[in-house]
A protein has these predicted regions:
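Glycine- and aromatic-enriched mobile tails/lids
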Residues: 6-172
Length: 172
C-alpha cells in the first residue's frame, strides 16, 4: 500500500531536474526567510481570521516566486542547494495547510488562540483536525486543494473510571 504509483518516480525526477536546471532569479534563502517572517507575524499562537488570511495571500505569492527559484549547484550528488529548494516547496505546502486548518477552526484551544474566537468550543471542536493536500496548490484557492477532515479525541480512563487527562482550558 505504500509504494509509488507507476510512473510517479519519473514525475519526481522531472521535478528535480526542473528545479536544478531552472534559470530563475529567486533565492531560496530569501523566500524561506519571507515565509518564516510572515508565519511568525500572522500565524503564531495568537491569530485572527484576518492575520491568517493575510498569511495565505503571502504564501500564494511565495509559491509564484518559488516557480522562479534559482539553484546554484547543478551537480547530481550531495546537492544541498537542490535539497533546500525541494524543502522550501514542502515548507510552502505545510505552511498553507497549517494556516488554512487554523483559519477553519473557529475557537481557541491549546496553542491555537484566536483573538476573534477567544473561547473553546468542545461541542464542535473536541476532535483532531486532519488535513490533506488533494490538488495542485499553484492553480487554485486553499479550499480547492486542501481537504479538511476530523478524527474524534479518544479519552482514556484510569482504574477508577476517571479521565487520565480531563479537558481543561489553558490560561495565557
Amino acid at each position: 500500500d505504500f509504494c509509488l504509483s507507476r510512473g510517479l518516480g519519473d514525475v519526481y525526477k522531472r521535478q528535480l531536474e526542473g528545479l536544478r536546471n531552472n534559470q530563475g532569479t529567486e533565492r531560496i534563502a530569501v523566500l524561506r526567510k519571507a515565509l518564516q517572517d510572515e508565519m511568525d507575524k500572522g500565524a503564531q499562537v495568537f491569530r485572527t481570521h484576518e492575520s491568517l488570511e493575510h498569511v495565505l495571500g503571502v504564501i500564494k505569492e511565495l509559491r509564484d516566486r518559488y516557480m522562479n527559484v534559482h539553484v546554484d549547484d547543478k551537480g547530481k550528488r550531495f546537492n544541498t542547494d537542490l535539497l533546500e529548494a525541494v524543502e522550501l516547496g514542502f515548507l510552502l505546502d505545510i505552511a498553507e495547510v497549517v494556516v488554512y486548518a487554523a483559519q477553519n477552526r473557529e475557537e481557541s484551544r491549546g496553542g491555537h488562540m484566536r483573538d476573534d474566537f477567544p473561547t473553546r468550543n468542545d461541542e464542535k471542536y473536541m476532535q483532531h483536525t486532519m488535513a490533506y493536500l488533494t490538488g495542485d496548490p499553484h492553480s487554485s484557492t486553499p479550499s480547492d486543494h486542501i481537504k479538511l477532515d476530523w478524527k474524534p479525541v479518544v479519552f482514556t480512563k484510569n482504574e477508577q473510571g476517571e479521565l487520565n487527562y480531563p479537558p481543561m482550558e489553558r490560561k495565557y
